[in-house]
């Protein structure tokens, strides 16, 4: 397995496909890729003012993560994974949890100001405080989110079933007729009690 936790954004849009192709090449058959990405919603609810989000993004690009340009809508990320040869198994939205994580980071940052100021300038401390506080706000109102994606290296049917058995043990172990009944319909195994 290979994991990438919020680093794909720093690869950049121009290098995203190449990055995913390299990960795919490094994985063994039936290998699993766990990727956590910061993302943006595709669209906004009618009347939602997203200028604040745009300003936050520009602030991040200039002062916090220069060149990190791949915080994208989830559909774009999924398409990139599929084009690189991955099969997406699961997508889990961590947005509400992540806003709480950001809040804890902000509180910790503020509580350690003296220690941080011994190493970094006051200007750097303030810049990161603004970034963390703004990130909490943007995440809470849905302007950004974090997704955890489980993807596997696509392969033959045998490989696919092995991957599924690893991710969901026992589900695919029954022979086809026992799972689907004669003629392909549901068997008694799955209809008892319904």
Where are these regions (language model features)?
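A short acidic, Gly/Pro-enriched loop at the edge of an enzyme's catalytic core
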Residues: 1-2, 143
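Substrate-binding/catalytic lobe of Class I Rossmann-like enzymes that use SAM or dcSAM, i.e.
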Residues: 39-159, 166
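Beta-sheet entry/capping signal
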Residues: 1, 30-33, 87-88, 148
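A short glycine-rich, Lys/Arg-flanked "PGG" loop and its adjoining helix->strand segment in the class I
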Residues: 17-32
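Alpha/beta-hydrolase-fold catalytic nucleophile elbow
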Residues: 36
């Amino acid at each position: 397995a290979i994991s990438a936790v919020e680093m794909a954004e720093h690869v950049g849009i121009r290098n995203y496909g190449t990055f995913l192709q390299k990960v795919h090449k490094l994985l063994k058959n039936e290998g699993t890729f766990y990727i956590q990405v910061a993302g943006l919603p595709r669209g906004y609810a009618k009347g939602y003012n997203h200028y604040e989000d745009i300003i936050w993004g520009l602030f991040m690009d200039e002062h916090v993560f220069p060149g990190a340009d791949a915080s994208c809508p989830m559909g774009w990320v999924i398409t990139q994974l599929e084009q690189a040869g991955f099969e997406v198994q699961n997508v889990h939205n961590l947005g509400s949890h992540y806003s709480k994580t950001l809040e804890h980071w902000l509180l910790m940052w503020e509580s350690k100001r003296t220690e941080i100021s011994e190493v970094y300038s006051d200007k750097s401390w303030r810049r990161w405080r603004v970034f963390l506080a703004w990130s909490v706000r943007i995440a809470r109102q849905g302007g950004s989110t974090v997704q955890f994606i489980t993807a596997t290296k696509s392969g033959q049917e045998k490989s696919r079933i092995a991957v599924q058995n690893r991710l969901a043990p026992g589900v695919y172990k029954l022979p086809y007729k026992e799972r689907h009944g004669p003629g392909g319909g549901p068997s008694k195994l799955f209809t008892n009690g319904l």
